[in-house]
Amino acid sequence: MVLEMLNPMHYNITSMVPEAMPAATMPILLLTGLFLLVWNYEGTSSIPGPGYCMGIGPLISHGRFLWMGIGNACNYYNRMYGEFMRVWISGEETLIISKSSSMFHVMKHNHYSSRFGSKLGLQCIGMHEKGIIFNNNPDLWKTTRPLFMKALSGPGLVRMVTVCAESLNTHLDRLEEVTNESGFIDVLTLLRCVMLDTSNTLFLRIPLDENAIVFKIQGYFDAWQALLIKPDIFFKISWLYKKYEKSVKDLKDAIEVLMAEKRRRISAEEKLEEHIDFATELILAEKRGDLTRENVNQCMLEMLIAAPDTMSVSLFFMLFLIAKHPNVEEAIMKEIQTVVGERDVKIDDIQKLKVVENFIYESMRYQPVVDLVMRKALEDDVIDGYPVKKGTNIILNIGRMHRLEFFPKPNEFTLENFAKNVPYRYFQPFGFGPRSCAGKYIAMVMMKSILVTLLRRFHVKTLGGECVESLQKTNDLALHPDHTKSMLEMIFTPRNSGWCLEH
């Protein structure tokens, strides 16, 4: 857009006027020059980006984010203005960074440990100063994070391998539940149910209706994505956000019922089990006065949605990549046979599965699901020579950074990109530092366990030659396949058998 190309400039009006110019023209030119200066001026910034344009620039940049989605808009602006640039969201200065050195600086410092988003939007979805994912109150976030870290490490991490494998095998034995009339597998639904079942087994342990909860999780995610950066005026028109409010309420009500049952069971027990699960830890924290009941429910909600929301889509993309790259599948199967053999995968196998690990890393680099991180500066700072004021919003465009620096073949899917160790400043699928993903270690365990268990039993194939590159996707808060425009089903062929589910 033309307005976005108008950057702050210095005009020397008199040098542009010919000597023979009529005297009456001079005031007009001076006024025009003054107008242009005001038009493009917000306070001179050394950071590249669209012009302020008497407030029109911020409206256009925010509008672009709402129209294109956060991820697509970030890629657009980085292409237009470079890897460190400035826009506005809700009138607030926002930096979009895809430069590794700048990203490293932001991730490692505590004064970037807060997130940003519409306060009204976060209140609507229950994340404003609650839970862990978008809790932008650093003090309250520090109260909940240790509870998540404890649940996602130690005994929970060790048990995850067996729990994942058992859950997946159970669901694979009931494939007809996610198989259509043509014999094609609804892989995303399968993976989401497995992820939810695994999370419930480890962290809540209350019987639930998987399909109903998975459906409500998708509705909640759609609301979260839609409301995160909406302007305040949006929330003054009830019919605009009513459907999102209902989607949020549906999931929150379901979690309330599950947690009420958990509280009832805890009260009925004479003695707590030796290994206390996450839900019990939350309820005990509530009884101590550390957390409110509402915050407890929000923490449980976020623990249950994390894997079905992001990890299931990551695994879905991985299966599509395996289907397109038989040489990669062959290398993975060879390693599985060598490390695991004919038995079930165990915790001791996880570190030995290097080919599987490199495949996961390359998949997350080449086709990420979460390819951006949103932060807020809590104090004045300087990043790579650019001044950053307290309160500045920051979006780290991780997906773009993974395609710009270090990797020998950044625009290709190949395990050669991880043939040698990659310095962690150049590869951050989970982030690092004080606000890194709390579940980054257990996520790797889950993905390895799922891939080994599934690929040992089935060869996977896409429909009609569909591949990751050809899938229609939405790129907003996260990058998801668009089920309305692409064929997302797959064919599962049992290994060591001529029988195929497509027949």
UniProtKB/Swiss-Prot annotation:
Keywords: Heme, Iron, Lipid metabolism, Membrane, Metal-binding, Monooxygenase, Oxidoreductase. It is an enzyme of class 1 (oxidoreductase). Disulfide bonds: none annotated. The keyword NAD does not apply. It is a peripheral membrane protein. GO terms for cellular component: endoplasmic reticulum; membrane. Substrate binds at D309, M374. It catalyses: testosterone + 3 reduced [NADPH--hemoprotein reductase] + 3 O2 = 17beta-estradiol + formate + 3 oxidized [NADPH--hemoprotein reductase] + 4 H2O + 4 H(+); androst-4-ene-3,17-dione + 3 reduced [NADPH--hemoprotein reductase] + 3 O2 = estrone + formate + 3 oxidized [NADPH--hemoprotein reductase] + 4 H2O + 4 H(+). GO terms for molecular function: aromatase activity; heme binding; iron ion binding. Its main location: membrane. It comes from the Eukaryota. Pfam families: p450 (PF00067). CDD domains: CYP19A1 (cd20616). Heme binds at C437. Its EC number is 1.14.14.14. Catalyzes the formation of aromatic C18 estrogens from C19 androgens. This is Aromatase. It comes from Callithrix jacchus (White-tufted-ear marmoset). The gene is CYP19A1.
